[in-house]
Regions:
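Bacterial N-terminal signal peptides that target proteins for export
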Residues: 1-9
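N-terminal signal peptide c-region/cleavage motif recognized by signal peptidases
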Residues: 17-19
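Contiguous segments within soluble domain cores/interaction surfaces
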Residues: 22-119, 123-141
Length: 141
């Protein structure tokens, strides 16, 4: 009986030291999103709520991101931001993230405070490596 304890303990230590398996991204939801970007094995899909972004009105954005091309793995982290490149400034508010599942988050508190050309920025992280995807959006009064 005493011989089993060290073997069991060794097995537990080996399992604990092994790297965690990465999660697959929710590809079933990825295809259902109205807007998508893909570049070099990284894909991002999203939808806003409300669907039409109004000037100076809060909205949320649900984002799904996948990395590693054919393997379709969930990234370690996603962030969303927006700015007006022609004006050299971003939003006046910082959105808050709510993680729904691996590779799937909602960002609340997005506000485009003035009309014009905005650039949505999606930063998708695989460990410390960041892949940035952008989409231009025009908001009118």
């Amino acid at each position: 009986m005493n011989r089993l304890v060290p073997a069991s303990l060794t097995s537990m230590l080996i399992l604990a030291a092994a790297p965690a398996q990465a999660d697959h991204c929710p590809t079933d939801k990825l295809g259902a999103m109205p807007d998508r970007l893909a570049e070099d094995g990284t894909a991002v899909a999203w939808r806003t709520n409300p669907a039409k972004i109004a000037v100076n009105r809060p909205f949320s954005i649900e984002v799904i991101a996948c990395v590693d091309g054919e393997k379709q793995m969930a990234p370690t982290r996603i962030s969303v931001n927006a700015g007006m490149p022609m004006h050299g400034h971003g939003m006046n508010y910082t959105p808050s993230e709510k993680k729904l599942a691996p590779g799937n988050s909602t960002f609340d508190g997005m506000v485009f405070h003035m009309p014009g050309k905005w650039q949505l920025t999606f930063d998708v992280y695989e460990g410390e490596t960041r892949k940035r995807l952008t989409r231009n959006v025009t908001v009118r009064r």
